[in-house]
Amino acid sequence: MSGGGVFTDILAAAGRIFEVMVEGHWETVGMLFDSLGKGTMRINRNAY
């Protein structure tokens, strides 16, 4: 892999940062989708 070292390092670093972000925010995202789903269900129930 001659010449592609820097790009590979950047990709690896970006992947690690992304992993940390996903790990940190996963519960928040889950709670968000949970409340979003409940809200959608409530709206659907009221619509009919």
UniProtKB/Swiss-Prot annotation:
A single GO CC term, please?
Answer: chlorosome envelope
The residues that the entry says bind a bacteriochlorophyll c are 25
Q: Which GO terms describe its biological process?
A: photosynthesis
In Gene Ontology terms, what is one molecular function of this protein? metal ion binding
The alphabetical list of record keywords is:
Bacteriochlorophyll, Chlorophyll, Chlorosome, Chromophore, Electron transport, Magnesium, Metal-binding, Photosynthesis, Transport
**InterPro entries in the cross-refs:** Bchl_c-bd, Bchl_C-bd_sf
Q: What does this protein do?
A: Component of the photosynthetic apparatus. The light harvesting B740 complex binds bacteriochlorophyll c.
User: Can you name this protein?
Assistant: Bacteriochlorophyll c-binding protein
Protein species of origin: Chlorobaculum thiosulfatiphilum
Q: Name the gene for this chain.
A: csmA
